Curated annotation (Swiss-Prot):
The lineage of its organism: Bacteria, Pseudomonadati, Pseudomonadota, Gammaproteobacteria, Enterobacterales. This is Formamidopyrimidine-DNA glycosylase. Involved in base excision repair of DNA damaged by oxidation or by mutagenic agents. Acts as a DNA glycosylase that recognizes and removes damaged bases. Has a preference for oxidized purines, such as 7,8-dihydro-8-oxoguanine (8-oxoG). Has AP (apurinic/apyrimidinic) lyase activity and introduces nicks in the DNA strand. Cleaves the DNA backbone by beta-delta elimination to generate a single-strand break at the site of the removed base with both 3'- and 5'-phosphates. Its EC number is 3.2.2.23, 4.2.99.18. HAMAP family: Fapy_DNA_glycosyl. Keywords: DNA damage, DNA repair, DNA-binding, Glycosidase, Hydrolase, Lyase, Metal-binding, Multifunctional enzyme, Zinc, Zinc-finger.
Length: 269
């Protein structure tokens, strides 16, 4: 599933081609996504794009009368293409732009979403979200406060959007490795120093992935059709049985809440 770096990479890639241009119309080939494509999107016509923003793993296209909320789901990607390029099997939504480009949404599993809202505030998919991990609000003090009485393993807690948004399976595993923290540790067992370090490395890992265009394991592509290159820098995720890049100990794979977790027994305590 695309996580924060992949969604932010998509935002940065599509923004220059959308802001200041006008949506001439939308072409919906298959509106049966995780939720049906909103009727308002079908009716788009001569609509300028004012901004392209992101909240958690949602892309937000600001229009004069409302917002398009896009979620990439498990396998979605957005590309900027010439208008004349024929669609393929899993290309479900096109926004045809006034500058001769299209924003094309591709999603083999069809678990993404294209929704419409007049107001972002209070929308059900955006309500009750925690802070952005790259914001000043997310720091060691905040993390310690939220972990202090939490009797659950730190790995799934990092993936809870009520704590912090956008830190999915890949980046939770990578951040815990960078901080030297075992994924099975109770959140409440983390010291002040460990919370401070973990908050800092989460930011560093996410920023590095954004610099590399995100992580492509299977389906994700940047807006120019290129893969994300952070996969080449993964320390533990997806490396079961391979030697730790630091100490040589084989990487272990377990499961938390049905999600794969990767770690080094020697480096993470």
């Amino acid at each position: 599933m695309p996580e924060l770096p992949e969604v932010e990479t998509s935002r940065r890639g599509i923004e220059p081609h959308l802001v200041g241009a006008t949506i001439l119309h939308a072409h919906i080939r298959n509106g049966r996504l995780r939720w049906p494509v909103s009727d308002e999107i079908y009716r788009l016509s001569d609509t300028p794009v004012l901004s392209v923003q992101r909240r958690a793993k949602y892309l937000l296209l600001e229009l004069p009368d409302g917002w398009i909320i896009i979620h990439l789901g498990m396998s979605g990607s957005l590309r900027i293409l010439p208008e004349a390029l024929p669609a393929e099997k899993h290309d479900h939504v096109d926004l045809v732009m006034s500058n001769g480009k299209i924003l094309r949404y591709t999603d083999p599993r069809r678990f993404g979403a294209w929704l419409w809202t007049k107001e972002l505030e209070g929308h059900n998919v955006l309500a009750h979200l925690g802070p952005e991990p790259l914001s000043d609000e997310f720091n060691g003090e905040y993390l310690q406060q939220k972990c202090a009485k939490k009797k659950t393993a730190i790995k799934p807690w990092l993936m809870d959007n009520k704590l912090v948004v956008g830190v999915g399976n890949i980046y939770a595993s990578e951040s815990l490795f960078a901080a030297g923290i075992h994924p099975d540790r109770l959140a409440s067992s983390l010291s002040t120093e460990e919370c401070d370090l973990l908050a800092r490395v989460i930011k560093a890992v996410l920023l590095r992935s954004i610099e590399q265009g995100g992580t492509t394991l299977k389906d994700f592509l940047q807006s120019d059709g290129k893969p994300g290159y952070f996969a080449q820098e993964l320390q533990v995720y997806g490396r079961k049985g391979e030697p730790c890049r630091v100490c040589g100990t084989p990487i272990v794979a377990t499961k938390h809440a049905q999600r794969a977790t990767f770690y080094c027994r020697h480096c993470q305590k």
